[in-house]
Amino acid sequence: MMNTDETIFALSTVFGKSGVAVIRISGNHALKALNHFHVNKDMKPRFATLVDLYDSSDQLIDNGIAIYFPAPNSFTGEDVIELQVHGGKAVIKIVLEELSRIFVMAKPGEFLLRAFLNGKFDLTQIEGIADLIDAETKMQAKQAIKQMSGELEKLYSSWRQRLIAVQSKIEAYIDFPEDVATEKNELEKINDEVQTLVQSIQEHLNDNRRGERLREGLHIVITGEPNVGKSTLFNFLARRDIAIVSEYVGTTRDILEAHIDIGGYPIILSDTAGIRESSDPVESEGISRAKKRSCEADLRIELFPFEQRYNINCNVISSNTIYVLSKADDVINDHDIKISDIDFLPVSILKGIGTEKLVSVIKEKVEEKFVYDRDVPVITRQRHRNCMQKAIEHLRRFNMNNPIELVSEDLRLAASELGVVTGIINVEEVLDDIFNNFCVGK
C-alpha cells in the first residue's frame, strides 16, 4: 500500500502542447508549493488566483492560476493545490522539476486512493471514474456516470445493512438462547428476509452480462464462405481500409478486429477467414479460429452470395444472426428477400444498396442485448459478479435448522463479500489492482 503521509504531485493533463496544463498537489503540506514558487498572495479557498511562478533561482517560469482546496472539502480529502500553467513542454518540465525538490511524484491512481481512504468515494465509484475515462461511446459514458454517482454502492450497501441487521438478531439469540423457543415467529421473519435477499441478488446476477458487455464491447463477427464480400463489409462498417480486399480466395486468414460505435454502443467487429475445406495448414488454422470466434460472438453477420441465393441451405436459424445477401449489385431496393423462411437482407457496398438498413438492423439487434430497467444498477465488472456469487452461495447455505452459530457465520460471510465490492472490507490486492490501472495524474 502507498504511503499517504507524504505530499504528492503530478501532471493531471496530457504532457505535450496544449493551451493549459493542470498540475495537482495533495497532502498536508500542499500550500508549501506556493511558497516554493515565491507566491505571497492570500489564497481564498476554491477561488482562482492569478500568480507568477518563480524557480529556485528566482527566474520567472510562467504566470498562471492557482486554486486552493482545503481539507476535507477537496477531491482527495486533503489540502489540494491545482496549478494551471501554459501547456508547453518546457514550462511543464520546469514546474515538475521544482515540485520534485520538495514533494514526491504521485504513483498511478494515488490521488484517487487517497480520496477512497478519506471516504470521498467507494470502490465502485472509483471504477466508474476509470470507466468514464476509458469510455469511447455515449452509452459507455452514461453507464460510467451512473456508477460514478454511487448507484451500485447504494444497492450493495443496502443489502449489506439488511444482512447485518438479520445477523444482529441471530447474535442476540446466541447470547440469550432461552428466547429462541419463544420467538418462532421472529425466526420465520428472519428466514423470509434472507430468502428475499437471495432472490434480489440472483435477479441482479441474471442480467445477461449487460453492464460488462457495454463496458467491454459487444462482439460481432462477419462470417461466410470465401469471396462473399466479408472484408469489403468489414471495411465499410469500420469506415476505413483495414482488411485487404482481393478476388483471390483465402486472402483473409487471421482474425481482424475493429472497434466501432453503432448507435452509441461499443462494438468489437471481427473479419474472419472464409469457411471452406482447405489442405493449406495456415488457412485451415484461420478457418478453425473463424469458427471458434463465430461461436463465441454475441452477434453474427452471415454472408451469402446474391447470385447463389436459390442454392442457399441454412440448417440452423439463429436470432443472433443477421443474414445478408452480399454483392447484390442487381437489386433495385433493400427489401428483404425470404428464402427458406429466413429474411435475407440484400446488400451492395458498391452501389450503396441496403447499407443503411443493415446498420439499422445491427443497431436494433445490439439494443436488444441491452434492454433492461434503466433505473436498476447493473454489474459492470467480473470482480462484482464474483463477490455476488460468493455471497449468494453463503446465503443458500443459510438454514434456521442448522446450529445458530453456523447460521450467523453464513450471514457474516455473505455481508463480507458485499463489503469487498464497495471497499468497506479492505482487501489490499484488490485495491492495488484497481488503483494501479489509473494514470499518474489521477
UniProtKB/Swiss-Prot annotation:
The keyword Heme does not apply. Exhibits a very high intrinsic GTPase hydrolysis rate. Involved in the addition of a carboxymethylaminomethyl (cmnm) group at the wobble position (U34) of certain tRNAs, forming tRNA-cmnm(5)s(2)U34. Residues 217-367 form the TrmE-type G domain. Keywords: Cytoplasm, GTP-binding, Hydrolase, Magnesium, Metal-binding, Nucleotide-binding, Potassium, tRNA processing. Its cofactor is K(+). Its EC number is 3.6.-.-. It is found in: Cytoplasm. One of its GO terms (cellular component) is cytoplasm. Belongs to the TRAFAC class TrmE-Era-EngA-EngB-Septin-like GTPase superfamily. TrmE GTPase family. PANTHER family: TRNA MODIFICATION GTPASE GTPBP3, TRNA MODIFICATION GTPASE GTPBP3, MITOCHONDRIAL. GO terms for molecular function: GTP binding; GTPase activity; metal ion binding. The gene is mnmE. This is tRNA modification GTPase MnmE. InterPro entries: G_TrmE, GTP-bd, GTP-bd_TrmE_N, GTPase_MnmE, MnmE_dom2, MnmE_helical, P-loop_NTPase, Small_GTP-bd. Homodimer. Heterotetramer of two MnmE and two MnmG subunits.
